[in-house]
A protein has these predicted regions:
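Actinobacteria-biased recognition of intrinsically disordered, low-complexity terminal regions
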Residues: 1-21, 28, 278
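Extended, aromatic/histidine-rich regions of cofactor-dependent oxidoreductases associated
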Residues: 5-7, 215, 236-238, 242-278
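Forkhead-associated
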Residues: 49-100
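Broad, structure-driven detector of short, well-ordered beta-strand segments within folded domains
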Residues: 60-68, 113-119, 194-198
Length: 278
């Protein structure tokens, strides 16, 4: 194993052309996902609801937050359609929605617009998704550091005896998120051991949400995320920091992203992965 120019120990020597080709395909898919008609770039507003029924920006009907959930009052002429796993239903009268805290919201369609009804901590809000939002129509791509095999690293996963529900802050003051921490991931950079709390992902995968010395300089201040496949039987992992991504809040002020877990700040500059959007 060779020592990298900055002291990073790569997992193996890989042909940079292969690494670049794989990354190019991944990055193109990532940008395409961001730019879908109702993706993160389409957010146009974030409106916090009160118990008083009131109009919402851009869509008809009256909306309010109650202890039971979000109440919508509308007529068929208002053309509000609630998406459902079974079949869409048009609002005719009063409907109560029950979004889950910290999860993707319930979607209500109005023509080309989509209202995402979300719950965050003890509050409810509406996120308006508009394909014509300036953040989407002016999108030209996500800047990133040059691909470098030095940032493909060996790591080890040490699972906790039991998963832990932890509290982290949010980019919106006063909100909290409650992800599940499942263990620690350790690796070495510049000869120094680095440790990150790993959050649960789907099907045993891990999510590493961290800050580093680039945060607030060339990358988003609130940190970035690396998604990792499920560890091997002995806890072995490969971390490809070239695939570190921004959270949605790096692209829009209307997201409510979590902040990294306490202690998830690396002592090095991870000059790999996505940079701060222009």
């Amino acid at each position: 194993m060779e020592r990298g120019r900055q002291g990073v120990v790569p997992v193996m020597t890989r042909a940079l052309t292969d690494l670049q080709t794989e990354w190019d395909a991944w990055h193109s898919a990532r940008e395409a996902e961001l730019a879908t008609p109702h993706g993160w770039l389409s957010l146009r507003s974030l409106q916090w609801l009160t118990p008083e029924p009131s109009a919402a920006e851009g869509v008809p009907g009256l909306w309010s937050a109650t202890p039971d959930g979000v109440v919508i009052t509308a007529t068929p002429a208002d053309d509000l359609v609630v998406r459902s796993v079974r079949e869409p239903r048009r609002v005719d009268g009063t409907v109560t929605l029950h979004p889950v805290d910290g999860k993707p919201g319930t979607l209500v369609e109005h023509g080309d617009l989509v209202v995402e009804v979300v719950r965050r901590t003890d509050s409810h809000a509406l996120r308006l998704r508009d394909p014509a939002a300036a953040t989407r129509t002016a999108f030209t791509g996500v800047p990133a550091f040059p691909v470098d095999e030095r940032w493909v690293l060996e790591a080890a996963f040490q699972p906790y005896v039991e998963p832990r529900r932890i509290a982290v802050g949010a980019v919106v003051e006063g909100l909290s998120h409650f992800p599940t921490a499942v263990g620690d991931v350790t690796f070495r950079v510049d000869g120094q051991e680095q440790r990150l709390v790993a959050l649960a992902g789907p099907d045993g995968a891990l999510s590493l949400h961290f800050r580093d010395a680039t945060s607030g300089v060339s990358t988003y201040p609130g940190g970035r995320i690396l998604k990792v496949e499920a560890p091997g039987p002995d806890g072995e992992l490969t971390l490809d920091f070239n695939r570190v991504v921004n959270l949605p809040c790096a692209f829009t002020e209307f997201a409510t992203c979590p902040l990294p877990p306490a202690g998830n700040t690396l002592t090095v500059a991870v000059e790999a992965g996505e940079q701060l959007p222009a």
